[in-house]
Amino acid sequence: MSPTPPETVTPLWQQFLRWAARVGLAKRLAFALSLAALVAGFATYTALTESAPFGETNPRTVTWLLTLDLALLLLLGVLIARRIVYLWIGRRRGLAGSQMHVRLVAVFSLLAVAPAIIMAIFSTVFFYVGVQSWFSERVRTAVNESLAVASAYLHEHQQNIRADALAMANDLNQEAARLASDPERFEQVVATQAMLRALSEAIVFNGTTGAIVARSGYTFALEFDPIPDDKLATARRGEVAMIVSENDDRVRALVRLDRFADTYLYVGRMVEPRVLSHMASAEGAVREFGALESQRGSLQITFTLIFLCVALLLLLAAVWAGLIFATRLVRPISALIGAADRVRAGDLTVRVTERPAEDDLALLSRAFNRMTTEIESQRHALLSANRLIDSRRRFTETVLSGVSAGRDGLDAEGRITLSKFSAARLLGVKDAESLIGMRLAELVPEMGGLLHEAPGRPGLVVQDQIKIRRDGTTPLTLLVRISTEGRGSGMMRGYVVTFDEHHRTWSPAQRKAAWARRRPIAASPTRVKNPLTPIQLSAEPCAASTLKEITSDTEVFTMCTDTIVRQVDDIRRMVDEFSAFARMPQPVMKPCNLNDLVRQAVFLQSSAHAGKIKFDMALPQGPLTVPCDSRQISQALTNLLQNAADAIEGRPPPAEGTELPPGHVAIRVEADAERIAMIIEDNGKGLPTEERDRLTEPYVTTRAKGTGLGLAIVKKIMEDHGGVLTLEDREGGGARVGLVIPQHIPPASGTAAGDAPGGVGTPAETGEEKRHAAHGA
């Protein structure tokens, strides 16, 4: 037992793709991304403008929002690019509705892009103009002037306290002698000087030890705030050192007291807090203004990119919405187009899904379904009618198949619009369809006169006999009938041309009728021959006895009696041939040696024309046995050999100085597995060009004394033996006649002699039959 093959495990990614296609994950994801893009874009705009609900936004929040915007932008871009690629592929493949889908997407995208681009341009320009106004010269001057005013105010305080410090130091230096020895007074003087000069604090200290010599009021801030060394060094040089406190709420001055040993005056004055606050704000504004002005270019680019990102995000969301709307609009139209293509291809069972909504597309779908249903029912009716018409056509063709006449339908300009196979055969064309569209007057110029005459005789049939010859073949006599067809308004619609051979082979029924009519005639030759013998017997002795008594005009008398005897003999011969033709018996098929029959026939004719015509034979070796009627075959050979001898004797006289070649008749017998051909050639005057197709008809002859029954009898014999008679021109002059019979002749049909299928009116075979017989020979 063969092992069971392991089951194929589907990869997870294929399972995921199938699940995604089943639940419509792509559509759901696209909808979620579009909604998220709208929300993220609005949130980013609100955060950048510091509007509610964010208020003053944390930079990290803006960064996260911008990152989310970029991620959504990329995902939406991928989805839209994927959908556009599918649209492009569908258009390249020529899918139904793809071109309309592309146009709708282009229109919706343009409607979404145009406002966004316009707003982006105006917003960028507005932002650029706004930034330029922020950093204009007037704003820069105002900011700098505000800082200058604040600085001037503080500088004024510093100058005032400097002057007060110098004045107070000068007063203390003047009282140095008394104050140095009286510390209490020194402290009172310092307090008085501080109060007079509106100083909030003042102390005198020793620069070496740092000990306080005198103070005014509460001077804890001065005592505990360290004095920078550089300021102390400035004061030692005799200059006034200005000191600003760390919290900028007061201004201080340090000056050296020259009359005291290494002693310094350190005073301070409080500054208005609002003034200091304004000054700090002005300084901060100036710093920020400078920083922003230095980053103005990058700021413009950053805000422009952020705006473009948000705008592009919203734009892609709008484009995706347009794609979805266009798809929903085009899908039923594409279904209608595809269904229409299937209807065009012949599938009338196709139907489109009808939408439940009562909109125009739903009405169109229902109308299409009703239309296809009606067309399908009409098609079934037409097919039934066509089947009925086709059956009637086949019946008509079956009925008309026995009609040998050719029939062509022509339009008003004489072009063939309908042609029967028999018409093509009579005109020498293999395919009747090849005649469609050709002008009959150009194809058969002999019919041009009748076609020109027919329009002048509306309602009547124009007919005449014409002879046509094609490529050197035997002339063909046609009986042509032309009638016109009208539209009922006096305008001619076309022609109906019917033509047939004037002397065509009779049908079997016609032949039987003709042979039946000959039965009572078969007894006539006996009644005609009965008086001929007495006439001949009386003329000869009468001439012999009377000639002795006639003394004058004996030559005339002899000529007259010879004429009587000769004409009586000719009449007897004609009666014998007619009797043989009329009494043609049913052949009796027995095995016979054709070589012996040929030798006997040639011997009789060579004996009759000894010294005048040379007869040659070319026979196969050994006996050539075939079932046939030896008497009829001998009669056929005798008739043909006699015709050859008569053709040689009937040659026209040669031109002066020339001689006719010796008369020569050659007969050869050729056999193959199927046929035996007996071919007789002579160098006589040849076959006539006119009426050649009628040579095998009874009573048709070109000789003065011919009866016109010899070839008719031969043709009848060949037909009874299942063979054919061929008449052709011999190369170099003369005629070539062939008798072709099959090796195995089918049994007789049992018809009586009078019902034989051959007979009067049987023409020679067509050229194709002759060629076939010659090829078989």
Swiss-Prot record:
The protein's name: Nitrogen regulation protein NtrY homolog
Record flagged with keyword ATP-binding: yes
Domain Histidine kinase: 523-745
GO BP of this protein: nitrogen fixation; phosphorelay signal transduction system
Localization annotation: Cell membrane
GO molecular function list: ATP binding; protein histidine kinase activity
Gene3D superfamilies (alphabetical): 6.10.340.10, Histidine kinase-like ATPase, C-terminal domain
Entry function: Member of the two-component regulatory system NtrY/NtrX involved in nitrogen level control. Probably activates NtrX by phosphorylation.
Membrane topology: Multi-pass membrane protein
Origin: domain of life: Bacteria
Enzyme Commission numbers on file: 2.7.13.3
UniProt KW keywords: ATP-binding, Cell membrane, Kinase, Membrane, Nitrogen fixation, Nucleotide-binding, Phosphoprotein, Transferase, Transmembrane, Transmembrane helix, Two-component regulatory system
Residue stretches spanning the membrane: 29-49, 61-81, 107-127, 202-222, 305-325
One Pfam family named in its UniProt record: HAMP
Signal peptide positions on this chain: none
Region named Disordered: 745-777
Annotated HAMP domain residues: 327-380
